UniProtKB/Swiss-Prot annotation:
The gene is asnS. This is Asparagine--tRNA ligase. It comes from Desulforamulus reducens (strain ATCC BAA-1160 / DSM 100696 / MI-1). It comes from the Bacteria. GO terms for biological process: asparaginyl-tRNA aminoacylation. One of its GO terms (molecular function) is asparagine-tRNA ligase activity.
Amino acid sequence: MQGTLIRHLGKHVDEEVSIQGWLYNKRSSGKIQFLIVRDGTGLVQGVLVKKEAPEIFELAKELTQESAIRLRGIVREEPRSMGGYELTVTGLEIINLAQEYPISHKEHGVDFLMDRRHLWMRTPRQNAILRIRAEIEQAARDFFNQNDFTLVDSPIITPAACEGTTTLFELDYHGEKAYLSQSGQLYNEASAMAVGRMYCFGPTFRAEKSKTRRHLMEFWMIEAEAAFFDFEDNMKLQEEMVYFIVQRVLERRRQDLELLGRDISKLEAIKLPFPRLSYTEAVELLKSKGEAFEWGEDFGAPHETIISENFESPVFIHRYPTEIKAFYMKPDPEDGRVVLGADLIAPEGYGEMIGGGQRIDDLQLLEQRLEEHKLPKEAFEWYLDLRRYGSVPHSGFGLGLERTVAWICKLDHVRETIPYPRMLYRVYP
């Protein structure tokens, strides 16, 4: 049977309701017991007075942390309680009496908690992160749908690398080599030639032997590709999407942000349009800060942090040197040394959150780039077909969901941004 959700208790003040959930915590003053119950939508305190319900009072003494229960009671307004309401308990049913719970309310080490990630997710903090992640995903879907983009799923098993990297998870696909996708981008370009504007959500995999706070082996990308979009159109789309997401989270998940201790003013300070720095300007900025950095090098995490510290909003770095970007990036017609690619760097030191750019639409140039990058042309014949049959200017990007969640929630590590993180040397549970 369904009960009333805790988040809806405000609609039932002075009414008797039934809620279902798990015992998060309890305390007693001898004659009164306080049962803190969670149901995934919030927490509520149930109050049990011994003299008013002695049998229920005794039954409640048996309850252990995370026991599944059904509570019946009268909803009362109580500003001092979590959520502003509490329940005067009139009935209690134990659905399942939990065994001794391994995660207590004291501090635990990260490895201990990661080994019990399937249980750690039940805490209010982890609940809040998961809800914010879900809100970000829903906001992105709403944004794309409002802008006439079509959801087109891309494959996870692919015959070739998207960018020719060595960080691939290789598979034996019925005797042939195949790989777990690092990006749906090449397929997204094909989809854009079919539907005009497309987006997709999907897991991506990179076998990077990295243990930084920004890296996972398996992570989710929100990707988009649009025919007839040039470089500037692409950056405008990105900033509007990120702004839309931030505003949606502020509107609908403020309480979760507050639970996490997030400085909400940092998110409220974000304005459109986002600042733009050319790669060359970013290099000069780093040098002015005393960094030994040469034109042609790629930015590392410390460099991105230094750059981001100069801006309240995310900042675009655009027109990177050709040598450090992917083979499909379109050269800048005004400067052949650089490509029409841009990264969006998150504020507060969270690094690159979006990578994107305008794609090469000329067949001969794309064939030349494949050769320069020593990529097998035969594996990309289908991709070259896109330039043979009705090629048009087109652009796209990919947003790293976990890094975006980490920034919006201001988390120390991306491992908390995904239900079951896959990191170097960790694939359990």
